[in-house]
Regions:
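A short, basic N-terminal segment
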Residues: 1-35
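Hydrophobic anchor at the beta1->P-loop junction of P-loop NTPases
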Residues: 41
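Conserved lysine of the Walker
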Residues: 49-50
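Accessory nucleic acid-recognition modules appended to NTPase machines
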Residues: 195-353
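Domain-level recognition of nuclease-like catalytic cores that cleave nucleotide substrates
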Residues: 393-414
Length: 414
């Protein structure tokens, strides 16, 4: 065990010596580390959770355990591990537990460490870490930081352009970068080297399905699981139901389909957006729209005869809203009016609708503008909301219709 931990210390030190892409933090690192609560960094694989945790602790004395290591898991002995940590990391202040969800009964062990006064930073690639798995023993004991692939603004930072303060001579470059991001996404490895995009994301997608879904849940029918994942990534931004998917893909039961859908959400690969309705029963019955965590997966995996820029932009807007803290269980929905007009995103704050967001890549056609504006104003009337936005690729203006003022903004100003 000591050899494993010593090897992991070498791994930690090597990781700390590397240069890293800069991320924008929505939190105060010093305040976070000063808290006695568990610091939990969650998000998809390979978005930089481990890097962020290492950078947070770079100038601190901290111990490190990487649970993506099979030798560590195979020889696991909690008491022995703690003795070896004291030996390898004398006088450590923090313990970094990387991808701790791979350890069986991890929550019980973490709870015990917390009870003993250990200051913990944890990373994990499973959305359910904050629900069923942590609901009992760790409730009220943690602070969460959720990480996603690079935002558009962070992508511009990497390319040394301030998205919020563009100079006239940067407009052409900015348009190229915005289009690049929409098509290829923001995974850190891909941002650093665009030549890697398709091969890297193809492998990553398959790895998530195998490590975080099939292996974790002991899925026997890998073919059906893969077929569902391919169907979802190819039909992103479209409404789906478990019943329809079961029939379309020839699965054995609706329960199996729903179970697989839930499994594919857990590692942050897919999100399912409910249709807004005041009646919870009707909302649960309605189709949900499926979104993928990064547009690059669409380029790498989707079956498509031609790219759909409108759907790519819509997916990008959705992920940006998730990044800002909107929750598909509580605060973000789509909506269909009584006349079947659709709004892409309904944003709720408590009991009130705070904003309606429509996405339209190109509004240069009068027919397209009329369709989008009519949908927005009709739904605004039904939902009693006056804060109306249409997000476009590069259009910016104000439209007034039926007493409503609609802000048309480019994605760069969302």
């Amino acid at each position: 065990m000591k050899t494993i931990i010593l090897n992991q210390r070498k791994e930690r030190d090597e990781l700390l010596s590397r240069p890293y892409l800069t991320r924008r933090n929505s939190y105060d690192v010093d305040m976070l580390l000063s808290s006695h609560l568990i610091k939990l960094i969650t998000g998809p694989r390979r978005v930089g959770k481990s890097t962020q945790a290492l950078l947070m602790l770079r100038n601190k004395n901290f111990a490190y355990l990487n649970f993506d290591s099979q030798p560590l898991l195979d020889s696991w002995d909690a008491n022995l591990v703690m003795r070896m940590l004291d030996d390898v990391y004398p006088d450590y202040e923090y313990i970094l537990l990387d991808e701790v969800q791979n350890l069986d009964a991890w929550d019980m062990w973490v709870s015990e460490l917390y009870r003993l006064g250990k200051n913990l930073v944890i990373t994990g690639s499973n959305a359910k870490m904050l629900s069923s798995e942590m609901a009992t023993v760790l409730t009220g004991k943690y602070l969460q930081v959720e990480m996603l692939p690079f935002s558009l603004e962070e992508f511009f930072d990497w390319n040394k352009i301030d998205l919020k303060a563009l100079k006239p001579e940067q407009q052409t470059d900015a348009s190229v970068l915005t289009d690049d991001y929409m098509r290829n996404g923001g995974y850190p490895e891909v941002v650093a080297s665009r030549q890697l995009t398709r091969s890297y994301l193809d492998t990553l997608f398959d790895s998530i399905i195998w490590k975080d879904v099939a292996k974790r849940h002991h899925v026997r029918n890998i073919t059906d699981l893969n077929n569902l994942a391919m169907y979802l990534v190819s039909n992103f931004c479209n409404p789906i139901t478990a019943n329809d998917l079961t029939e379309e893909l020839g699965f054995s039961s609706v329960n199996t389909t729903q179970k697989f859908m839930d499994y594919l959400h857990e590692p942050y690969l897919f999100y399912y957006l409910p249709r807004y309705n005041n009646k919870l029963k009707l909302m649960k019955k309605a189709p949900r729209k499926v979104y993928v965590v990064d547009n690059g997966f669409v380029a790498a995996k989707a079956f498509a005869l031609s790219e759909n820029l409108g759907r790519l932009l819509e997916n990008q807007v959705f992920i940006e809203l998730i990044r800002r803290g909107y929750d598909t269980d509580k605060t973000i929905f789509y909506y269909r009016s009584r006349n079947d007009k659709e709004i892409d995103f309904v944003l709720r704050n408590g009991p009130h609708i705070e904003r309606l967001v429509q996405v339209c890549y190109d509004m240069s056609s009068p027919k397209t503008e009329k369709r989008e504006v009519n949908s927005l104003t009709e739904c605004a009337g039904e939902l009693n909301c006056n804060n109306l936005v249409i997000v476009t690729n590069n259009d910016e203006r104000t439209i007034e219709k039926d007493g409503y003022k609609i802000d048309v903004i480019p994605i760069s100003k969302l």
